[in-house]
Structure formats: structure tokens, C-alpha cells
Amino acid sequence: ATINSGDEVIIPAPYWVSYPDIVVLNDGKPVVIECGESSGFKLLPEDLEKNISSKTKWLMLNSPSNPTGSMYTKEELMALGEVLKKHEHVYVLSDDIYEKIVYDGNIFHTIAEVCPFLFDRTLTMNGLSKSYCMTGWRVGYAAGPTNIINAMNKVQSQNVSSTASISMAASVEALNGDQSFIASNNESFLRRRDLVVKNLNETPGLSCRVPEGAFYVFA
């Protein structure tokens, strides 16, 4: 809906496997930035600056991350925002699907929240699959600039039309209903995380950092 031939999309790595292919299928060019363990597998402002060109259309951010479990802090997002402030042609796609799965007192932040000047340049993606354990129901949603949402609606309506009506009704109940189960669900994820991290770090030749969110460990 927004990419023309040759437009570039910046994708911090490690990333969810489909990100680059989605760009290629839309005739765009993925610009992958390797983010190592020393930065917590997170994009640094100086690396973002170096990779922005006149053809850059989007920056993709996923926090908490699939597959690393890394989370951007408020300060880290603000630092990225200061770079983007200088490049008004670049939009941000914020994949917030794991926003409610966080551990150890970490607080979820999204870039449009901490950088209000990016509000009109941010497309937020979310869904019910992760936090509400509704993977098979196939319900997602987006919020962003009106012109982009309208363009997305045109593509969506000719692609898959809509999800099943029962899925939409169930999603309304999930979003509006009792949210206390999320905390207990996260406690189960936390126990599994700690067990996996402990065993990996005790295994010769393997190591991993402790993820702040999501339900992945990257070793």
C-alpha cells in the first residue's frame, strides 16, 4: 500500500523471518542492519543514521522482539526518534504484538508514545495471537495515519476480505473482558524462560542473554 519499486525498508536483525520477504513481495528493498548481542540485539541510533537514504520509506521496529525477546527502553526509542526527526520522509512500522508479555518489571513503550512528533508517521500493528493466546483465530489490527489505513483497507479488501465474524466477536470480548489472566499467563512464561536460560547458559558452548519480553530465547 505504501512501497514503490526500489523503496527501502530498514529491518534490524535478528528479525521475524517474514519481514524481508514482505518487502520484496511489494517490490521494495530490505536494508538489514545487524544488531549484535553487545547492543542487546537492538538498533543503535548511529547505525540507523548511516543506513537512511533518500529511498528509505520505512523503519520496522519489533519490541519485545521475535526472536530475541529484547525490549527497547523509553530512552532508546527517544534516541532513535531524534534520528528520525531529521528524516521526515521515513515512516515507522511498530510491531507491538508482544506488548503485554514482559518480565522483571520492564515497562513496554512504543515509539509514537515517547516521540509525539512521530505520531503521524507511525503505523502500529498488533493482534490477539500472543497476549490473548488466540493464534488460530487470525485477528490483527492496525492504527496509523488515515491515508495509510485507507490504502491498507483497499489492499486488504481485495486480498482476504475479512476474518471470520466469530473471531471478531471473540476478540472484542478478549479486549474488553477481564485482563487478570495475562499476569498469570506471564508467570508461566517467566518460569519457562528462567529454566531455558539457566539450562542453556550451563551448557558448554552455548550462551544466551535474559530476554525482557515475548516468549523466545536467542542463543
Features from the language model and the residues they span:
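Active-site phosphate-binding strand-loop segment of PLP-dependent enzymes
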Residues: G36-N106
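A short helix-loop-beta submotif of the ANL/AMP-binding
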Residues: D21, L25-V31
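Structural signature of PLP-dependent enzymes
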Residues: M152-Q156, L175-V197
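Active-site PLP attachment segment
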Residues: V114-A151, T163
